[in-house]
Amino acid sequence: MDALEEESFALSFSSASDAEFDAVVGYLEDIIMDDEFQLLQRNFMDKYYQEFEDTEENKLTYTPIFNEYISLVEKYIEEQLLERIPGFNMAAFTTTLQHHKDEVAGDIFDMLLTFTDFLAFKEMFLDYRAEKEGRGLDLSSGLVVTSLCKSSSVPASQNNLRP
């Protein structure tokens, strides 16, 4: 094989593996956005969100919750992917994901990170708890209403309006 053939072979192999990776990510998006997955995750979080506190210290009770989450959600996603891609290998995909992490949409990568990164998992629960307790992100103090009409900058006495 000459250099040109090797380069062409490498390019076609790379393109095929990139296409396969992109297909898996597309399926993941579909699975994560599906109502069934949303319900599964929401029910799990409803069950445990009060256990989580926003402190530096991690309670021992978090570990079995984390392990149960991994078993439940990762198993569900893997089953869904196997239905769509016979022979799918989650371990191989996770390895490939590390090489392509900059190419994956933030929401998907963050969700996948909750399987392997305990702090991301804990943060997900803390965000959910804040939302459930009405402590979600409040942007109202940062909003300012301004008129787009030029006349609003003219004093009332000059634009024939009575106070």
From Swiss-Prot:
Keywords: Cell projection, Cilium, Cytoplasm, Cytoskeleton, Mitochondrion, Nucleus
One Gene Ontology term, aspect cellular component: centrosome
Molecular function GO terms recorded: transcription coactivator activity
Pfam families: ARL2_Bind_BART
Tissue-specific expression: Expressed in brain.
Gene3D superfamilies: ADP-ribosylation factor-like 2-binding protein, domain
Record's subcellular location: Cytoplasm; Mitochondrion intermembrane space; Cytoplasm, Cytoskeleton, Microtubule organizing center, Centrosome; Nucleus
GO BP terms in the entry: maintenance of protein location in nucleus; positive regulation of tyrosine phosphorylation of STAT protein
Function: Together with ARL2, plays a role in the nuclear translocation, retention and transcriptional activity of STAT3. May play a role as an effector of ARL2.
Name of this chain's protein: ADP-ribosylation factor-like protein 2-binding protein
Taxonomic placement: Eukaryota, Metazoa, Chordata, Craniata, Vertebrata
